[in-house]
């Protein structure tokens, strides 16, 4: 490092101090900040004013097109669109526009922490219990985010990327500017010009599927503050604290004649010309320039995910920590470039191999230029840093090796003529093409290749609404929120697919935690095996009311199928003076109306399940006349009981009695009477025994609860499929009664049917659910079904599943992708995504989300609490039992202990 010394000379002791000696004390030492080009930012025009106080610049932040599991055809289309943007969006001038792109990773999830906290506060239910649960959940998530950003990474990803996986955010910043002369006689001022070009640029980028936003001085300052103060003493190197502590004041709070550049450096930068490095906070920094392309680049060359050997990663993933990539394009008029190429062609005369190669290259360049493939002067620079000169040299060697392996030829540090100047020239908005006369660093690159090199490719980040927080393979947050109307096109109904071992249970516990914490949603869970018992205990721990029900003969649980019969009768009589069962049958079959429930149709379906026992063969024999008889019996049962003055609901035995009455009706044909008797006998099986316990009792009303968990219990066993379907229908009716009554509050309702393949095997249940969920869309009630596979789903479920906008598939095997295709039209791109999902036990599972507005591959790395609550394996139960015995605590407290242990690993 260069010696630090006072400016000027030490006066001799035997001579008087002269005015010249005193003047040296007042000299302003040269500073790197003096070379930074911007002097001000205008909020009204959203432009930066450059050092000449005349030229203007615009800054943007880019979110690249998702490249995970994308086909080569898709990437080629993106490349073509980017090339069009380069060629035709930014006009060419003799004094040209410059487009600079910078890529850097922020090893921090502080923005996600703030976003989640703000999002939760804006949506959380304002009761003491929900606020307590929400604050605890957010705090745990924030600790999880902090743990993810540790320098060593959270884990080694041996399955996909082949490197350490760490939480971070990849930031791509773009600068567009043109230096103008005061007397250039152009008819448009620089600010108007830059904004017109910027508007076209933004429009074209958005049309390509690239996210783009305009940035201001706060964005520039926050970024460069981290760049130039990598180990600030004031915060002991904590860059998140630094950006909070040293945030840029608002315009009205800034001191007179403030200089944005001077505010950026908390310690004086210094340089070491011998080693060609700048020192920021005593850390050496170096610029590495790419001299040439050794071979044609691939689409998304730097930031797109691609296959390399057995691994999938982006080139930028492998660069050393703290690296910054810069691509600087000069939008030069093509006639000037063509003249230059022609000069090369004319001078390439001779029989030497070098001359012949130059001639061939020049001819090839002119050919492609004639086809619209522009040649643009380009400078590619890698900024890197180290903890010491030795560490910097090690990282420089890593960068050079990586560039060479990927077809890019870097200039070796010992061959770099002006390394300190190179660093300064390539800083944001600092490059001036007209001054590059000697030691030219720019190289002519075809726009088709630039369209592959530019960092406009990336990984999906979702919609940005942290209702559900996941990550991508690069460690960046991937968030979306089905319950947010901005993220959905139609509804928030969801289907979650995942074979055993795919992490489906952990995913659903994690989803429930977020839904109850962020929205305070009313939760209903239908499950098998007690997978969500601990989740219920967790909610109860914070004061939420929890009702856990098991479908077992010893439990006082009643789900009467015909409880809505009186309401049905009232509605039908109100609609028409003379009730016509046949007309109602036609209306029920043809209605797509979601304004009002089809109560009679729902009860008919329940009766049909009782009559057929859920047997598909018997259901196939069910005629229209049979259905009409069933409806008549339900209506007669309601009318008779109402006429008798009974206040008790209509029970199954009442419908059986009505059916027996129809079997004795002499006005009917013998065949119909016989069929009515058969159906009455079949339904009578549900009036006694276990079935009668569940479906032929008034029972007691279910308590109001924040969380209701119904364990299928006995009915999940083989041979009880019909009763399970009826039980599921009964709970749906219970839920519907609540959400209809509470439809004017702000609270959403989330209904999860776990192990849905056990429930939906009966085609009639799918028809029933279609009827009921049509209403739920307008009641803010969202049904999610989770299942191991779709193989057991009948074809009749297609209409139901077509109503579900959100499909989440966890690590699906090939056969399951084929099953998905039975119910949902999949594009080749979507099939490719589904095939690409991977898992690494103990670290992560991947899945694919498909909705109308979002299609992406995500990585589930839930917080330890979600994992601990989802642990239902025998060895996991043994672990909790040991903790309970050792610490004399409850099972939930043992869960917290397991979560804390996972957090400290």
Language-model features: locations:
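Extended, folded cores of ATP/NTP-driven motor/assembly subunits in large transport
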Residues: 1-444, 455
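P-loop NTPase motor domains
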Residues: 77-88, 314-317, 420-478, 484, ...
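Hydrophobic anchor at the beta1->P-loop junction of P-loop NTPases
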Residues: 496
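Walker A (P-loop) phosphate-binding loop of P-loop NTPases
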Residues: 501
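Conserved lysine of the Walker
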Residues: 504
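Hydrophobic positions on the alpha1 helix immediately C-terminal to the Walker A/P-loop
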Residues: 507
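Conserved H-loop
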Residues: 528, 754, 778-781, 785-795, ...
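A short helix-turn-beta junction within AAA+ P-loop NTPase domains corresponding to the substrate/partner-engaging
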Residues: 545-547, 797-810
